[in-house]
Regions:
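PLP-dependent amino-acid enzyme catalytic core
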Residues: 1-331
Length: 331
C-alpha cells in the first residue's frame, strides 16, 4: 500500500461561513441570496463593467418567487383575508410562483390550485403535484391571460377561495423593496450602479428600483421582456419560449416609471446566453436568467460603463427546465 499524502487545508478554505443559527421553519430560509462575480465571462466577452449575478435559486424552493410566495400569504393572514384549513388559494402562474406558493401553503396549512399555460415545463408541474397542489392547464396561445381568466372563474365558483394575484398584489414589489434591494445595497457596500431583471409581474424590478433609489437616485434599474412579445415596446402579445417573463400585458405590479429602460431579448439570445454561463462559469441558469444576463452583458460592454457595478437577477436554476429548449440536443 502506498503511503498516504497528508491533505492540504487549501481545498477546504473559502466555503460559506456558518450562520450560527437553527431555523425554526423552512419559511425562514427565504432570502439572503449571494452576489457572484463572473471573472471568466468578463474576460471572454471583454466586458468593461463589473457584472455580478444575484443567484435567486439559492432560495429554498429554487427561485426568486419564494420571496413573494411567503410574503403574499403572510400579508393576507395579517390582514385577516385567509384562514388556515379553510381558505382555498388559487393562483395563475407559469410555474415558479406556484411552486413557491405550494411550499408556503403546505407550511401554513392551505390548499392550493394553480392555473398555468400548457407549455410550462414538466418539471414545474411535477413539483407542484409533489407538494399537493392541484393544477389546471390552459392553452399556450392564450399565455398568462388565459391562466388568469381560468383562475378568476374558479375564484368566483369555489367557496372560501382567495387569489394572491401576484400581478396585482402590493406585497409582491414591497418584499423586493424591503429585502432584495437591501441585500444588493449591502453586499455591494452601496457601490451598485445598475440592476437588470426580467419582467414577468414586474415586482422584482419595480421593488428593487424603489428600494435602491431611496439610497441613491442615480442607480439605474432596467427590465427585460421577450422580443417575440414586446408588449412594453408597443408590439402585440405573442407566444415565446422565455418562461416566467413577458406575460403579454402590463401588470399592476409593474411600475414602468421607476425603471430606466426595458431591453428586448429574443428566445434564441436568452437560451444561448444561459448555455454560455453554464459552459464558461459553471453556473447553470434558467432561460429568463439568460435573458437578464444577456441584457447585463450589453450594459457591461459599453465603454461608458467601465468600472461600474452591474447586477443581473437570476430567478431560477437550469434544472427546472430539463424538458425545454435549453437542453435541446444535449442528451
Amino acid at each position: 500500500m502506498s503511503k498516504k499524502v497528508p491533505l492540504s487545508p487549501a481545498p477546504f478554505e473559502g466555503y460559506a461561513a456558518p450562520r450560527g443559527r437553527v431555523f425554526n421553519s423552512f419559511l425562514e430560509t427565504v432570502g439572503g441570496t449571494p452576489l457572484v462575480a463572473l471573472p471568466y465571462l468578463t474576460q471572454r466577452e471583454h466586458l468593461n463593467g463589473r457584472l455580478l449575478l444575484k443567484l435567486e435559486f439559492f432560495n429554498p424552493l429554487g427561485s426568486v418567487k419564494d420571496r413573494i410566495g411567503v410574503a403574499m400569504l403572510r400579508d393576507a393572514e395579517a390582514r385577516g383575508l385567509i384562514t388556515p384549513g379553510r381558505t382555498v388559494l388559487i393562483e395563475p402562474t407559469s410555474g415558479n410562483t406556484g411552486i413557491s406558493l405550494a411550499f408556503a401553503a403546505v407550511a401554513l396549512g392551505y390548499r392550493l390550485i394553480v392555473t398555468m399555460p400548457e407549455n410550462a415545463s414538466t418539471e414545474r408541474r411535477k413539483m407542484l403535484r409533489l407538494m399537493g397542489a392541484d393544477t389546471e392547464l390552459t392553452p399556450a396561445s392564450r399565455g398568462m391571460a388565459g391562466a388568469i381568466e381560468r383562475a378568476e372563474q374558479l375564484n368566483r365558483t369555489l367557496p372560501d377561495a382567495w387569489m394572491p394575484s401576484q400581478f396585482e398584489n402590493d406585497a409582491n414589489p414591497a418584499v423586493h423593496e424591503a429585502t432584495t434591494a437591501q441585500e444588493i445595497w449591502e453586499d455591494t457596500a452601496g457601490k451598485v450602479d445598475m440592476v437588470v431583471a426580467g419582467l414577468g409581474t414586474g415586482g422584482t424590478a419595480s421593488g428593487i428600483a424603489h428600494g435602491l433609489k431611496k439610497h441613491r437616485k442615480s442607480i439605474k434599474v432596467y427590465g427585460v421582456e421577450p422580443r417575440e412579445s414586446a408588449v412594453l415596446h408597443g408590439d402585440e402579445p405573442g407566444p415565446h419560449g422565455i418562461q416566467g417573463i413577458g406575460p403579454g400585458f402590463e401588470p399592476d405590479t409593474l411600475d414602468l416609471k421607476a425603471l430606466d429602460g426595458v431591453f428586448e431579448v429574443s428566445e434564441q439570445e436568452a437560451v444561448a446566453t444561459a448555455r454560455l454561463c453554464a459552459a464558461v462559469e459553471g453556473i447553470p441558469i434558467g432561460i429568463s436568467s439568460g435573458a437578464a444576463l444577456f441584457a447585463g452583458m450589453e450594459l457591461a460592454r459599453k465603454p461608458s460603463n467601465r468600472g461600474k457595478t452591474i447586477v443581473a437577477i437570476v430567478p431560477s436554476f437550469a434544472e427546472r427546465y430539463l424538458s425545454t429548449q435549453l437542453f435541446d440536443g444535449l442528451a
